[in-house]
């Protein structure tokens, strides 16, 4: 029983580490996108935003992806492009 608990704790720690790495990657990408947008002229920003939004509209998610997840992604992309972090 102790071995099972130890094994589960180890797996949990590994998952937590993977989660931290993913959060760091997402935050790094947010910083990069924000910096890129800030260094673009307003008309270039708008053109890029329209292209990204248009590309998202044309994408049909796999049937196994829940609608909620798809909508969450769309909202996050919109927030990142239209309201970048400061």
UniProtKB/Swiss-Prot annotation:
InterPro entries, A to Z: SigmaS_Anti-adapt_IraP (IPR019732)
Listed GO biological process terms: cellular response to starvation
Keywords: Coiled coil, Cytoplasm, Stress response
Principal location class: cytoplasm
One Gene Ontology term, aspect cellular component: cytoplasm
Role description: Inhibits RpoS proteolysis by regulating RssB activity, thereby increasing the stability of the sigma stress factor RpoS especially during phosphate and magnesium starvation, but also in stationary phase and during nitrogen starvation. Its effect on RpoS stability is due to its interaction with RssB, which probably blocks the interaction of RssB with RpoS, and the consequent delivery of the RssB-RpoS complex to the ClpXP protein degradation pathway.
Self-association and partners: Interacts with RssB.
The protein, known as: Anti-adapter protein IraP
Organism: Salmonella typhimurium (strain LT2 / SGSC1412 / ATCC 700720)
Record lineage: Bacteria, Pseudomonadati, Pseudomonadota, Gammaproteobacteria, Enterobacterales
Gene name for this UniProt entry: iraP
């Amino acid at each position: 029983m102790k071995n099972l608990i130890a094994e589960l704790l180890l797996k949990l720690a590994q998952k937590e580490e993977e989660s931290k790495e993913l959060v760091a990657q997402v935050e790094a990408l947010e910083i990069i996108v924000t910096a890129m947008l800030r260094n673009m002229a307003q008309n270039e920003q708008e053109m890029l935003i329209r292209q990204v939004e248009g590309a998202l509209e044309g994408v049909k998610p796999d049937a196994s992806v829940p609608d909620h997840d798809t909508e969450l992604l769309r909202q996050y992309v919109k927030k990142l492009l239209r309201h970048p972090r400061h």
